[in-house]
């Protein structure tokens, strides 16, 4: 099993969610986060004064999936989240040792 974590632009969340649902991903966790990568933030003008915005709003989504589904999940996220501009985000894939559904006690793939 793998945990696929993606940091994406907030306005792309609905498209990514639909793409993941379309390939059979049954659950995701979404967290609003802030950060920066190569784009390093930007400056904004507010009431005549310039402000530096160091951390940009992003959305982190996490999905625990079976190994057989990982490549499809990556392709779905890439396809739905890509704008072709700096700041589209990143995808990370981690090994998951164990999953337990608290309600039923199911473990492994059955708990996903």
Question: Over which residues does each language-model region extend?
Answer:
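Positively charged, small/polar-rich N-terminal and surface patches that mediate targeting and assembly
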Residues: 1-112
